[in-house]
Amino acid sequence: MSKILLNTVEEAIESIKRGEIIIVVDDENRENEGDFVAAAEVITSEKINFMATHGRGLICTPLTEKKCKKLKLDRMVSSTSDPMDTAFTVSVDYRGDDVTTGISAADRSKTIRAMIDKKTRANDLTRPGHVFPLIAKEGGVLRRTGHTEAAIDFARLAGFEPAGVIVEIMNEDGSMARLPELVKVAKKFDLKIVLKDQHIQNDRNYNRLN
């Protein structure tokens, strides 16, 4: 697949700054998948609905370790057998803001925004719920090359709170979308699409210069 079809990391950051959703594609030798990625600070019910409808995977909210400790979001399991070491916490819903069942696009967007609100406390969240926080490794993609860390990095680089919203992108038949299909999705919805490797290299270059 020609790289001409992909965007630069800088273009992706500008898109996140505008409150848009981007596509971040994994390395072929890792999960080999693409995720819709957005900044949690500007998430809306419309964006959640888009991600659920066109992503079809599990909508998750990457957060920093510090934020998860503050909200007492413990890991879902004490010891994981997941080879990717995806750090799921217990799922949550927000108690306030007229949240009802917790599963609607509106309810999930309210829960996500509540989690990054500095005034929210641990007891403001019910457990279990319908939003799945993920604990990101400190140091971003240079520490762990996951979509979890990439989402945090993109949000931070765009000037938002270090928290994201991600969902895996599947094809209509339920199979995982790979790069050729992901490029088509990006074109269809006019979204920026980048390889995670580009972002990792961008971070390495930045660290060498600073």
Question: What are the residue ranges of the model-derived segments?
Answer:
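Catalytic domains of riboflavin
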Residues: 1-210
